[in-house]
Amino acid sequence: MLTSSTSIGLLTWAVSRHGYHWVVTTPRERTEEIERQVLSPRASLASATKGREREEPHDDLRTVYQRDRDRIVHAKAFRRLKHKTQVFLSPEGDHYRVRLTHTLDVSQIARTAARALRLNEDLAEAIALGHDLGHTPFGHLGEQALTPFLGRPFRPSEQSLRVVDYLENEGAGLNLTWEVRDGIVNHPWSMPPPSTLEAQIVRFADRIAYLNHDVDDALRAGVLSEAELPAGPMKVLGATHSERVNTLVTDLVAASEDQPEVQLTKPVFAALDGLRDFMFEQVYLREDTEGEHERATRLIRELFQYFLDHPKEMPEEYHRAPGDLPTRVADYISGMTDRYALRTYERLFLPRGWLHDQG
């Protein structure tokens, strides 16, 4: 092995019209060559990336998508996902999903499908790990509470892009590749389809993950019973969490093989849609959670108004970010974890211990 202060490489044989000769290749170059030889013609090759907003020297060890993945994992916003609610605002016990465990579920499903389809697993993983970085505290209630202040819908996917572009790394952003950024901002089903098949996989993996683990959490919380689960979708998808995920991932791989887009077969997609409709009716929009939802919404709105009136009390990085004051306040509020938002509200508005006394 040849090493220097700036590069790492191996001597390998190369063939040209002049015969065999030695060349130095880096681990990254060998990975890129393996991608060219092994991956599907429809895969996104790291060596063919559209690049970054700011050009950077190549890394000897990692491809561009591997570097993006690592940057996301080391981001502060990624670490905060462990204290952000997925669905249940006040879960009792340690087994309920939060944004971080959801993100890891999505990543695992996306990697499995990408590998099976000979697509770029590193790209799929990076998009999956970054897709929820912009989510608010208290789940979707947080984004609904922010919308009236902004004069436009607060979209977590757009906020995730803002996080990686402007808010991380002391305002310099993570400078991710075009493909990862496209996959992050276009992962919701309300957006145009992402440009890469890897990002389309993440879009499906997100829905597969959240519907199935939300069913699992609802059963654990006593919100649903096994007997209440919809018979039609359960018959198609399976009776258990693992059966349902296996059915969906296996179907996605079979239906997407050598196709120009990622898809499910019609019966399985219909069953997934049926399960989603059921979850919205029975779990996500349940009337008996309205009091809890109202408290979370009020907390977000009062915090927003406070920092709108006292912007100097926000950390310095939120003053450097581009955008008007409401946008920068939304940056700060949406970046809070559930417990940090509660502590901040308590510190600003309530006698010590009041929130805890309320149960």
Regions found by a protein language model. Name each.
Residues 1-6, 10:
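Intrinsic low-complexity, disordered N-terminal segments enriched in polar/charged/small residues
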Residues 7, 15-16:
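Intrinsic disorder/low-complexity segments in short proteins, especially the signal peptide
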Residues 16-103, 107-113, 120-121, 142, ...:
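Histidine-centered, transition-metal-coordinating active-site segments
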Residues 125-130:
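Short alpha-helix carrying the canonical HExxH Zn2+-binding catalytic motif
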Residues 134-135, 209:
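Short active-site segment of divalent metal-dependent hydrolases/proteases
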Residues 139-150:
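A glycine- and small-aliphatic-rich helix-loop capping segment at beta-alpha/alpha-beta transitions
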